[in-house]
Amino acid sequence: MTAGEIFSGDRSIERNLRQVTNPYLPSWEYVPDGEPYVFGDRVYVYGSHDEFGGCVYCPGDYVCWSAPVTDLGTWRYEGVIYRKSQDPLNADMQGNLYAPDVAVGKDGRYYLFYVLSDRGTVSVAVCSTPAGEYEFLGHVHYPDGTLLGEKDGDEPQFDPGVLAEGDSVYLYTGFCPRGDKSRHGAMCTVLESDMLTVKRAPVFVAPGCEYSEGTGYEGHAFFEAPSIRRFMGKYCFIYSSERCHELCWALSDSPTGGFKYMGVAVSGCDLGLENGKRADMPLFYCANNHGSIVEIEGRWYVFYHRHTNGTNYSRQGCLEKLEITADGCIKQAEITSCGSAKPLRGEGEYPAYIACNIFGKDEQVYVPWQGWMDDRFARITQQPREKGESFIANIRSGTTVGFKYFDIKGLRRISVRTMGYARGRFTVSTSIGGRSAGEIPIGYFNVWADGESEVDIPDGVHALYFTFEGEGALQFSSFRLIC
């Protein structure tokens, strides 16, 4: 795409994809680790850049997308904002651009903080606009010139999150894998207003799992992905926990310490929720997670990412509306196809790749580290060409594909578009393991073909689940709601 081009969906289902759907960017775009910000009348998302079929994290240059604050269904491609070749420490191009963050400096300019995949130091780029072409500025360093992360006693820097307030800039970093006692937790380093010079050395603000006993973080200790926001008059620390699939949150009156663990904001597989299932039943296949929260037009949202193609390395951004309790607490968001803001229209065609739930007879939470899911599991994938069509592949008997939620009014029939060497039926229901609302025959096809059936679904807001029973392996492209 060229900068400024607006994505509003594939032509055949363009109208329905102008609603808020997950993933919120085009099906062929892979921008995980999303840090959302409202600048002016638009929401900008900054993240790393995966690719379809990738074998490593973050091989692409940074791109930016934005949307009007009043329409989170219409995203505009802002173009490439920074290239990994611009960092002097990356002259050999061996380092990938890991998860970034952006802060507005005292001078009104926009500062992009990032870490290269093969370094333990923080780099900074700067731009006069939110989504222009950022220019390399420098590396975060101590007053004597030593780079943060290279001084004796420093822990390696990773996943920078940034908050600028007045004359101080708060930089949060850290990576704490299980079994590594050399990594203690998430760190906060205070910088000068030049965005580069260390004002106060790092202090630990949230423990890693090796040091969480007795802290209140047990079972949800810091792993990676630190992010910081102002929330309800306090400092809200968002991070990925030792469980990887969840984003947790902690609160403090100070940006440099005293953070109390509060709970889970979102799990990429809905673990912990009893939304028509056991709390320990995963509804999607997960690995790491990274994102943050943002207030848009008086509503709070959480941005996170999902995993596709049966690997760790093709991640896509998703969002959900948050429910804030009367006492100012974040309730764990349910993962949906509609971003939870309002249900999708109960008519017309929808792509299967907006599925929020995919699970089978064999329950599994995690996508294998440094590997691929085996042929027991379905996965969201795409045709192997630039901007290829996305679909769900390898649906086998017992697999359920779920979509949430639709405003159903007068629905009479549902058709599905499938392909593959499979025979059987899709049983349609509105809840996991619920009564059958209809059965759609599935045939053995070398090309995309449609199957259709009457359904009995009352008016109202409903989820839709398609459970395949039969033989062979099925590909699922789209479905149509016919009123």
Question: Model regions: which residues?
Answer:
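Carbohydrate-active catalytic/glycan-binding domains of CAZyme proteins
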Residues: 1-439, 443-483
